[in-house]
Regions:
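Amphipathic, hydrophobic secondary-structure cores in small proteins
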Residues: 19-55
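Intrinsic-disorder/low-complexity, polar/charged segments enriched in Ser/Thr/Lys/Arg/Asp/Glu/Gln
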Residues: 1-5, 32-34, 67-69
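Solvent-exposed beta-strand sheet faces enriched in polar/charged residues
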Residues: 7, 36, 60-61
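An N-terminal amphipathic alpha-helical segment
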Residues: 1-29
Length: 74
């Protein structure tokens, strides 16, 4: 299991979700994608994305610096 990182800071939704989707082919089953984003609607977008693709959203929360961090398992 590997952890890949994606910094989507500065992008407005749905751009962070599009960046997440573009990484799908790079990840293997069990890998985790850690995403940092500062879009105010990121949490709702990423929850819907994970639900649609049936990917576990392991964690989502405030990073302490005004940004959100989430972990998506593939």
């Amino acid at each position: 299991m590997a952890i890949a990182r994606l910094d989507a800071s500065g992008l407005k939704c749905p751009e962070p979700i599009l960046k997440i989707a573009s990484r799908i082919t790079e990840l293997q089953e069990g890998d985790i994608l850690e995403v940092i984003a500062d879009c105010p609607t990121f949490e709702s977008y990423v929850r819907k994305f994970c639900e649609r693709l049936q990917k576990p959203l392991l964690f989502i929360g405030n990073n302490g610096d005004g940004k959100m961090k989430c972990h998506i398992q593939y």
